[in-house]
């Protein structure tokens, strides 16, 4: 399914009108502000697993190394396999939301592929030229976002572990403080850093390309799901049975609505090494 992430338009720069009383009696020539619709797509995530009748009959028993306190085999292998597959799918979704390469299906045998943040953010980008992540790089990105009419309040900086270390080292070297996790957003606990452009929250993330950091406006981001009537989304169902076993599939469709892409920013080319200070 294709969905809209935003309607973009330009109103031009600020200017002072010079309209006399006489001129105001005649309406000016009409102009038209064009809009451009931006879209993304949901895509399919699907996993299958099979369980033999022999495995089902082995539920709750002990196997493997005989150690005191050993946990028995899962009581219901179906529930265990379902949970494990859902964990994998959740990580695949997170990877896609960050790194996904856009593709719109043109036929039933062509896959929809949801666009991720790396490929969505094009307006506010900053090349670090192998510099480590520091306060002024973050502030410079926020300045660029502000100059491009993006809100800079409540932003969240999504970083990998190396960049988080670099940022903490820079803050320490300059007598600054990164406030420990004190804010909850959709169940996510966030740290914060005060810059000349305002406060920005910090979140350690996975699947971020090396040398990359994101400044995200979480208020305009949400997952878009496609619900299968009578089944929901990311549901488990049994497939046709063959032999002494059972086969199941987990099926779901989801994509990322990142909102107006210029509401976000991205730094690339950061140093991928961290050298502790003395």
Report each predicted region and the residues it spans.
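Flexible, glycine/threonine- and acidic-rich loop/arm segments that mediate assembly and lattice contacts
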Residues: 1-201, 205-278
């Amino acid at each position: 399914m294709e969905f809209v992430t935003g309607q973009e338009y330009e109103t031009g720069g600020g200017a002072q009108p010079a309209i006399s009383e006489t001129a105001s009696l005649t309406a000016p020539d009409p102009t038209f502000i064009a809009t451009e619709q931006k879209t993304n797509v949901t895509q399919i995530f699907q996993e299958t697993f099979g369980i033999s009748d022999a495995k089902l009959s082995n539920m709750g028993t002990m196997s493997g190394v005989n150690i005191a306190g050993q946990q028995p085999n899962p009581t219901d292998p179906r529930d265990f396999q379902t949970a494990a597959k859902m964990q994998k799918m959740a990580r695949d979704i997170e990877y896609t939301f960050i790194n996904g390469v856009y593709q719109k299906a043109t036929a039933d045998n062509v896959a929809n592929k949801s666009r991720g943040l790396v490929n969505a953010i094009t307006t506010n980008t900053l090349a670090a030229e192998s510099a480590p992540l520091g306060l002024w790089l973050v502030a410079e990105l926020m300045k660029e976002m502000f100059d491009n009419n993006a809100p800079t309040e409540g932003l969240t900086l999504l970083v990998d572990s190396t960049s988080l270390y670099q940022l903490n080292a820079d803050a320490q070297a300059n007598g600054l403080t990164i406030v420990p996790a004190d804010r909850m957003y959709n169940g996510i606990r966030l740290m914060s850093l005060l810059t000349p452009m305002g406060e920005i929250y910090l979140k350690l993330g996975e699947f971020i390309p090396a040398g990359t950091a994101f400044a995200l406006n979480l208020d305009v981001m949400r997952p878009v799901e496609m619900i299968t009537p009578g089944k929901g989304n990311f549901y488990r169902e049994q497939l046709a049975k063959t032999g002494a076993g059972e086969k199941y599939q987990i099926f779901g469709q989801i994509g990322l609505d990142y909102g107006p892409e210029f509401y976000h920013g991205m730094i690339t080319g950061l140093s991928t090494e961290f050298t502790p200070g003395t």
